[in-house]
Curated annotation (Swiss-Prot):
This is Hydrogenase maturation factor HypD. Keywords: 4Fe-4S, Iron, Iron-sulfur, Metal-binding, Plasmid. One of its GO terms (biological process) is protein maturation. Fe cation binds at residues 36, 64, 67. Pathway: Protein modification; [NiFe] hydrogenase maturation. Involved in the maturation of [NiFe] hydrogenases. Involved in the biosynthesis of the Fe(CN)(2)CO cofactor. It comes from Cupriavidus necator (strain ATCC 17699 / DSM 428 / KCTC 22496 / NCIMB 10442 / H16 / Stanier 337). Its cofactor is [4Fe-4S] cluster.
Length: 379
């Protein structure tokens, strides 16, 4: 298939890896963070790290939307389903994220709550139209990639006067999170690692373009290379980052030229701006409160805002103390550093959100066997 098979060529991957090994200076460390969960998945699936020299390290960043969703947000959705008799609709991975008291949306569904998995925001609106006597709430999560469809469906609900439909908005923003990682004293208190450059997200960049990343390269001296999802995309991006570091450059480069432009999808951006505005602050799992890092629904669409309609009050909830998901999201620890990984915590029984989504670092490591260094204990 065009644009797929040719980006999975093993021989070409070996040649790119040879260039990385040749150009990475032996006495220097290269710490690169891939922000996108799709990149984390590709790196584990195709064994990219095994092709890199020891002094080139890939750090898994907070780019999985399910992983960064805090417990308190899931609790709000559970409250609507269990106590307000609402039909709650959301994407599949969100159903399994652990919430307070060991509950999750899928467990609440087993207890009788009307919680439904949907493939799109449009599915949730159709459910609201089929059940006009019930309140239907769409739990909307994701980065800039999934925000335009939510904006479109809110606008459509207003036009069609579907008054029993609302959205619990948990959409978050990539540039704000990267800024927070680079400069926040709170994150420094949590602990973090030195970052020499970023592999920029693919789908997000299709929407927002490369322009927003120019701030990081200019203000923080950090190179950014936007990369596609295939293994050769990631390998080439790593090589481009090594070359930037070696030459003392900090620029935004676009490896994913077949899909990403400097200005992105301006029609999608305009639609998002019409329906949403910035929140002053939003809690991220692993990062804490991040200023201006999420969206809320504008006043002219307030009747479709579940937080206002149901007078919801967000309450932060601490993570499971034994789960290292927060530290893994910051790159401080690897999945194999967590004592729950591949023992109590598996994709079938996730203790933390990093094991829920296939884009999560723990799930990717588990699914593709990247944990062979865990010592086996004899029975």
């Amino acid at each position: 298939m065009k644009y797929i098979e040719e980006f999975r060529d093993g021989e070409l991957a070996q040649r790119i890896a040879a260039h990385v090994r040749a150009e990475a200076r032996p006495g220097q460390r290269y710490n690169f963070m891939e922000f996108c969960g799709g990149h984390t998945h590709a790196i584990s699936r195709y064994g990219v790290t095994e092709l890199l020299p020891e002094n080139v390290r890939m750090i898994h960043g907070p780019g999985c939307p399910v992983c960064v969703l805090p417990i308190g947000r899931i609790d709000l959705a559970l409250h609507l389903a269990l106590e307000r008799d609402a039909i709650v609709c959301t994407y599949g991975d969100t159903m399994r994220v652990p919430a307070s008291g060991g509950m999750s949306l899928i467990r609440a569904k087993a207890h009788g709550a009307d919680i439904r998995m949907v493939y799109s925001a449009a599915d949730a609106l159709k459910i609201a139209q089929r059940h006009p006597q019930r309140e239907v709430v769409f739990l909307a999560i994701g980065f800039e990639t999934t925000t335009p469809p939510t904006a479109l469906i809110i606008r459509e609900a207003k036009a069609r006067q579907v008054d029993n439909f609302s959205v619990l908005c948990c959409h978050v923003l990539t540039p704000s999170a990267i800024t927070h990682i680079l400069e926040s004293p709170e994150v420094r208190d949590y602990g973090t690692v030195p970052i020499d450059g970023f592999v920029g997200p693919a789908h997000v960049s299709i929407v927002i373009g490369t322009r927003p990343y120019e701030h990081f390269s200019r203000e923080y001296g950090k190179p950014v290379v936007i990369a596609g999802f295939e293994p050769l995309d990631v390998m080439q991006a790593i090589l481009m980052l090594v070359r930037q570091v070696n030459s003392g450059r900090a620029e935004v480069e676009n490896e994913f030229v077949r899909a990403v432009t400097r200005d992105g999808n301006e029609s999608a951006q305009a639609m998002v701006s019409e329906v949403f505005e910035l929140r002053p602050s939003f809690e991220w799992r692993g990062l804490g409160e991040v200023p201006y890092s999420a969206l809320r629904i504008r006043a002219q669409f307030a009747r479709f805002d579940a937080e206002q309609r149901f007078d919801l009050r967000y309450r932060p909830v601490p993570d499971n103390k034994a789960c290292e998901c927060g530290a893994i999201l910051r790159g401080v620890k690897k999945p194999t550093d967590c004592k729950l990984f591949a023992t109590v915590c598996t994709p079938e029984n996730p203790m933390g959100s990093c094991m829920v989504s296939s884009e999560g670092a723990c799930a990717a490591h588990y699914s593709y066997g990247r944990f062979k260094d865990i010592p086996l204990v004899a029975a």
